[in-house]
Regions:
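Non-catalytic, conserved peripheral segments adjacent to functional cores
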Residues: 1-102, 123, 128-171
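Conserved metal-binding segment of the jelly-roll/cupin
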Residues: 99-122
Length: 171
């Protein structure tokens, strides 16, 4: 396992090791002791999976208290992480990553950050661990095309949920 800093303070890129042979491959997706050795001391208490088809864009969602560990179990998606912490020097900055079942990348997203993903393959399975239980009342939704961020999405007309169509612009 390799852990790398990203351009956003607090966001980490984790590249998982794989054991491969003629039968296929094996990947350990989480081991608390190993993550602790890399300075990631977060107690995750909820896991969620989202299955989406090509051109579906989910997000940008976040809250004030949740750490998320995001990975792709199948397919490929374009992930955007946004710093939504008004007290941060990096407020409104974003970074993108491509996650796939082949590259075995995980992204650790801190509280006060938002994330959204666009499915690039025919289908993708998005998996994330959280250190808090989901609280719909504490969520924020930022519009995927908010001009304040000028995010470079590789699509002009994604498939969106009603929630994501009515997100808000950031002032």
């Amino acid at each position: 396992m390799k852990v790398e800093k990203t351009n956003l303070e607090g966001v980490l890129k984790i590249i998982l090791d794989a054991f491969e042979d003629y039968r296929g491959h094996y990947v350990e997706t989480y081991n608390e002791g190993l993550y602790n050795k890399h300075g990631i001391d977060i107690k995750f208490i909820q896991d969620d999976i989202s299955v989406s088809n090509k051109n579906v864009l989910r997000g940008i969602h976040g809250d004030q208290e949740t750490w998320k560990l995001i990975s792709c179990l199948e397919g490929e998606f374009y992930l955007v992480v946004i710093n939504n912490d008004e007290n941060s020097l990096q407020y409104k900055q974003w970074e993108s990553f491509t996650l796939s079942e082949q590259n075995r990348i995980q992204i650790l997203v801190p509280p006060k950050f938002g994330n959204g993903h666009l499915v690039l393959s025919e289908r993708a399975i998005f998996h994330y661990k959280q250190n808090t239980y989901y609280n719909p009342d504490g969520q924020f939704t930022i519009l995927w095309n908010d001009p304040e961020f000028n995010i470079e999405w590789p699509i002009k007309r994604p498939i969106l949920s009603e929630r994501d169509k009515v997100g808000h612009f950031v002032d």
